[in-house]
Amino acid sequence: MVLSNKVNYWTGQAGREFEKEFAAWSGTAHAIALMNGTVALDVALLALGVGQGDEVIVTSRTFLASASSIVNAGAVPVFADVDADSQNITAETIQAVMTPRTRAIICVHLAGWSCDMDPIMQLAEQHDLFVIEDCAQAHGASYKGKPVGSIGHVGAWSFCQDKIMTTGGEGGMVTTNDTALWKKMWSLKDHGKSWDAVYEREHAPGFRWLHESFGTNWRMTEMQAVIGRIQLTRMPQWQTQRLANAQAIWAAAGECSALRVPVVPADTVHAAYKCYVFVKRELLKEGWDRDRILSEIAARGVPSFSGSCSEVYLEKAFDGTDYRPAQPLAVARELGETSLMFLVHPTLTTAEIDKTCAVLQEVMALATA
């Protein structure tokens, strides 16, 4: 690829082929390859016309980009609480914070578990709202037979280094079934070029006038696209292994009385980006809490974490703004104080997963009253 000197979107073919393959894989009509997952959210909001005076509802249990993209669009992030099992926003928590200024919803499918999308889409239709699916942690997840990223108006994907699949450290994608929206996003990511002017219009000899609006350069490189195409072929095997690893940890955790293991609905395929279980604090011995459990697990050589930021609005970036909710979001805070997160990536060996399970049970036996 490098020796060919065809290394950007306009000199090579890999980017365009990756877009076609990813659209087919995600069950959508269109896909656009981008430089990272954050600009996937940016281009979605811009194309939907979200801006000054608008409010966008989003979860607080997420990475900052889900909220900062709203701020950068000139809109106001409004944080909704989450479901205790999926850790995702729901139609009920969304409706609780809706106002006449609400323009859109960003649904983050946290850790590979999809939001309950039917009620959310029904609510959005009733109130003429746009829905962006943040699929950064959910490659391969599905809801009632539909791949995530194919249900809302736009799916925004990340291929960052630690995601389920990567394009060499950074990368992103947007997916949609709306052709007009696809053309608008395609134009925005490439200096305002018009798809019709580039591909579907006859031009007189001489200079070709292609830029019919204003945009910027958010294109993916050909090297990124080549890596993405290869990784996409490995997704079925990787997803099977990820889920098997998560199920082993869930089974071990299920034998610990002081742990709560959420049950994934039968109509949902979990992408198993990470594996979460939750501490029942009322069943712990005195002197034990989630953080001590994490420390004891780590001391025995097993990586374990508290998980995703539970109240992203507590970041310093929100100081001096009106974006923080008047009261802490109760469920999000509870999850943030009780969650245990484990790695389940497909390169982990059976011995490593077995050790994770054994250490988890050993530590919980010490911690449980």
Regions found by a protein language model. Give the residues of each.
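Short beta-strand-to-turn element immediately C-terminal to the catalytic PLP-Schiff-base lysine
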Residues: W157-S158, G172-N177
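Structural detector of well-ordered beta-strand residues that form the stable sheet scaffold
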Residues: I32, I57, V78, V131-I132, ...
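PLP-dependent aminotransferase-like
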Residues: L46-C135, S142
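Hydrophobic/aromatic ligand-binding patch that stacks against planar heteroaromatic rings
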Residues: S68-I70, L123, P147, I164, ...
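Conserved active-site segment immediately N-terminal to the catalytic lysine
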Residues: E133-G168, K183, F207-E212
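PLP-dependent aminotransferase class I/II
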Residues: Q13-K20, T28-A29, E92, A104-V108, ...
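Phosphate-binding glycine-rich loop
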Residues: V7-E55, S69-A73, F79-D81, K146
